[in-house]
Structures are given as structure tokens and as C-alpha cells.
UniProtKB/Swiss-Prot annotation:
The keyword Transmembrane does not apply. Belongs to the TACO1 family. One of its GO terms (molecular function) is DNA binding. Gene3D superfamilies: 1.10.10.200, 3.30.70.980. It comes from the Bacteria. This is Probable transcriptional regulatory protein Pmob_0807. HAMAP family: Transcrip_reg_TACO1. Keywords: Cytoplasm, DNA-binding, Transcription, Transcription regulation. Residues 1-22 are annotated as: Disordered. GO terms for biological process: regulation of DNA-templated transcription. It is found in: Cytoplasm. GO terms for cellular component: cytosol. It comes from Petrotoga mobilis (strain DSM 10674 / SJ95). NCBIfam families: PRK00110.1, PRK12378.1, YebC/PmpR family DNA-binding transcriptional regulator.
């Protein structure tokens, strides 16, 4: 599993333990609104919104709150003026980071991001110096125990438009072009697989971190995750699973 996705899973578990429901709901509501504003209010034709709705339901967000957030994105209801920004940064060990934020105050958020990066061994980067190393992709995951024939799954996924399948992860990861995410997801669901999906940024090259730099980076990622305006952080780091689990337990 890539470093980013492994950390995302650990972060999800931590979030449930920390019970930061208010902050979590704020982030989910903003993602619903931005996703609807970007691609329309129909989850079936808008994969980003579909993922946002699934995440909101998984967090037990009331249906009326989900619908209200979507309508604010489509303009059916008035809402706060939100801006989506992608900051480029470097972290410990030379790791490249993309920091996705949604904010109602760009100046405040820029100062907060800069402060957190500086405190934990990172720094903002010039525009383009980090983003070149990432590609926008669709990511579908399937529980490994559901798959009896990996070759059959791979053939089905490729015929539906997938680019790659990583069988060395659990859950299995299937990569698609963003525009093919929906059709691949539909083909897999029709075949009876349990799928989770999202749009993500995947690195073209990765950096293997020492234990020391890995610990610094996870502290930085944790601090960024704790910011109200930060939606997600993408990185090109590699950390051994055992090391990440051990370090994350102490953060």
C-alpha cells in the first residue's frame, strides 16, 4: 500500500477514536459543497461528490445536512464563500506534499499552513516545483478476501478501463484515469465486488524515509490533519508498514 493510503487508513481509525466529530463534519460538509460546485449535484455522474456522500454517510451525518451542503454547492441554497487551494510543500526527508485546503479566508489559512510546516520541519514550495510529480487518478479498493481469482478481476478491471491493479496491498488497489473511475466502479459492483472509490493524486516517484524522518513526517501530517481548513494531504513518501503502525501509535 502506498504511504499516503496507509496513513489515510490509520488517520481514519484515529478519527473514530478521537471523536473530533465537529471538525470532521465541517470538513465533510465543505467537501460536499465543493464537489457539488465543481461537478454538479448528482453523485452518479460526479465521482468526487459520490465519494463525499459515502464518507458523510459513514460518519453518520444526517441526511438533511448532506442535502443542504450539496445544495449550497449547486447554488440552490446560500452558503459561505469557499475557496479551494492546493499548496505545494516539502516535508522532512525531502518528501513532496500537496496540501488540499478549503477556506473562507485565504490569508488566515496561508499563515496557518506556513506555521505548521515550519514547526514540523517542512516548508512551502514554489508553484509547480512539487505538483509535476503527481498525477490525478481514480483509486478503487476491494477487500482482498473477496477476490478468489486475481486474474479474473484484473481482466474485468482492464476491460472496463482500469490502468493498473496492485495485488500486493490489502485492500487491493485499482488505478484508473479520472474520467474512467465511474465506469470501472460500476463494472466491479455489477460483478459483485464491494468497492470503495475516490479521486486522488498519486506520485510518479517516491522517497523512502528513515525511521527518524518518518517520525517527523507523521507528526507534520498529524498537525496538518488537525487544521480545520485542510481537507487532505498527498505525499510521495514510502514508510514500511510496521514502522508506520509503530510510529502512528505514539502520535
Amino acid at each position: 500500500m502506498s504511504g499516503h493510503n496507509k496513513w489515510a487508513n490509520i488517520k481514519h481509525r484515529k478519527g473514530a477514536q478521537d471523536a473530533k466529530r465537529s471538525q470532521m463534519f465541517t470538513k465533510l460538509i465543505r467537501e460536499l459543497t465543493i464537489a457539488a460546485r465543481e461537478g454538479g449535484g448528482d453523485p452518479e455522474s460526479n465521482p468526487r461528490l459520490r465519494t463525499a456522500v459515502e464518507n458523510a454517510k459513514a460518519a453518520n451525518m444526517p441526511k438533511d445536512k448532506i442535502e443542504s451542503a450539496i445544495k449550497k454547492g449547486t447554488g440552490e441554497l446560500e452558503g459561505e464563500e469557499l475557496t479551494e487551494i492546493m499548496y505545494e510543500a516539502y516535508g522532512p526527508g525531502g518528501v513532496a506534499l500537496l496540501i488540499s485546503v478549503v477556506t473562507d479566508n485565504k490569508n488566515r489559512t496561508a499563515q496557518e499552513v506556513r506555521h505548521v510546516l515550519s514547526k514540523w520541519g517542512g516548508a512551502l514550495a514554489e508553484s509547480g516545483s512539487v505538483s509535476w510529480n503527481f498525477e490525478r487518478k481514480g483509486l478503487i479498493t476491494i477487500p482482498k478476501e473477496e477476490v478468489e481469482d486475481i486474474d479474473e478481476l484484473m481482466l474485468l478491471a482492464v476491460e472496463a478501463g482500469a490502468e493498473d491493479l496492485d495485488e500486493n496491498t490489502d485492500p487491493l488497489e485499482i488505478i484508473t484515469a479520472p474520467e474512467n473511475l465511474t465506469q470501472v466502479r460500476n463494472a466491479l459492483k455489477e460483478a459483485g465486488y464491494t468497492v470503495s472509490e475516490k479521486l486522488t493524486f498519486l506520485p510518479k516517484t517516491t522517497v523512502k524515509l528513515s525511521d527518524e524522518d518518518a517520525e517527523k513526517l507523521l507528526k507534520l501530517l498529524n498537525a496538518l490533519d488537525d487544521m480545520d481548513d485542510v481537507q487532505e494531504v498527498f505525499g510521495n513518501y514510502e514508510i514500511d508498514d510496521e514502522v508506520m503502525e509503530r510510529l502512528a501509535a505514539n502520535i
